[in-house]
């Protein structure tokens, strides 16, 4: 249409060809449609909580009343678990668990694997420490101790924790503190604050 109108007004053939070519290019162009993608990139994670044997959330492992004879015999053990659920976006389906002190380690030089009594009470127990183990029965089989003086991560497989719950069983055991004997143990309050750190990979 544009070409024929230009011919009637006496345009040269070379101009007509140029106009025709321009018209074809104009009609061949496509529309531009904008697209904006919006998302939030998140690190893979789980919901991890500390629970007792009744699956109730806890923040304290409570031994209740303990006798010095039980401490000396290493028979006062309390079991608990880390509970993992709603896991997503974790490539290798693994969790690394580390326990670190918030008070001191056992031993006269504070160089022991157990966690020392961090109570500030005037009537606190002396020469007592707590060990934390990676199994329900301390110091047996594949059990690994969470060391106070040299914290190291323990690995947990959480591949099924996306649709189910994964438990990591542990135990705590009261013992006579390193470099001490049962004769050094005195009755009183005991508290050993520590922090579990969980990282995923």
From Swiss-Prot:
Disulfide-bond pairs as recorded: none
Pfam family, one: Fimbrial
Subcellular location: Fimbrium
Position of the signal peptide: 1-28
Gene Ontology cellular-component terms listed: pilus
Induction per the UniProt record: Repressed by H-NS.
Gene disruption: observed consequences: Deletion of the operon under classical laboratory conditions does not result in any major effect on E.coli capacity to form biofilms compared with the wild-type strain.
SUPFAM superfamilies found in the cross-reference section: Bacterial adhesins
InterPro entries in UniProt: Adhesion_dom_fimbrial (IPR000259), Adhesion_dom_fimbrial_sf (IPR036937), Adhesion_dom_sf (IPR008966), Bact_Fimbrial_Adh_Pro (IPR050263)
Segments forming a coiled coil: none
Alphabetical keyword list: Fimbrium, Signal
GO biological process: cell adhesion involved in single-species biofilm formation
Annotated family: Belongs to the fimbrial protein family.
Function field: Part of the yadCKLM-htrE-yadVN fimbrial operon. Could contribute to adhesion to various surfaces in specific environmental niches.
Note: The operon is cryptic under classical laboratory conditions, but is functional when constitutively expressed.
Protein name: Uncharacterized fimbrial-like protein YadL
Organism: Escherichia coli (strain K12)
Gene name in the database record: yadL
């Amino acid at each position: 249409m544009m070409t024929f109108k230009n011919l009637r007004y006496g345009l040269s053939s070379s101009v007509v060809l140029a106009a025709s070519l321009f018209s074809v290019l104009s009609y061949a162009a496509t529309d531009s449609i904008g697209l904006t993608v919006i998302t939030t990139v998140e690190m893979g994670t789980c919901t991890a909580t500390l629970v007792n044997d009744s699956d109730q959330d806890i923040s304290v492992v409570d031994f209740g009343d303990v006798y010095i004879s039980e401490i000396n015999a290493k028979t006062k053990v309390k079991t608990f678990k880390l509970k993992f659920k709603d896991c997503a976006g974790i490539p290798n389906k693994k969790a690394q668990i580390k326990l670190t002190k918030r008070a001191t380690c056992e031993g006269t030089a504070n160089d022991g694997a157990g966690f020392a009594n961090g109570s500030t009470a005037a009537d606190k127990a002396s020469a007592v420490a707590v060990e934390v183990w990676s199994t329900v029965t301390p110091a047996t089989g594949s059990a690994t101790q969470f060391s106070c003086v040299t914290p190291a991560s323990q690995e947990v497989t959480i591949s099924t924790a996306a649709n189910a719950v994964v438990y990591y069983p542990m135990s705590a055991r009261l013992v006579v503190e390193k470099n001490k004997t049962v004769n050094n143990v005195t009755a009183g309050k005991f508290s050993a604050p520590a922090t579990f750190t969980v990282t995923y990979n």
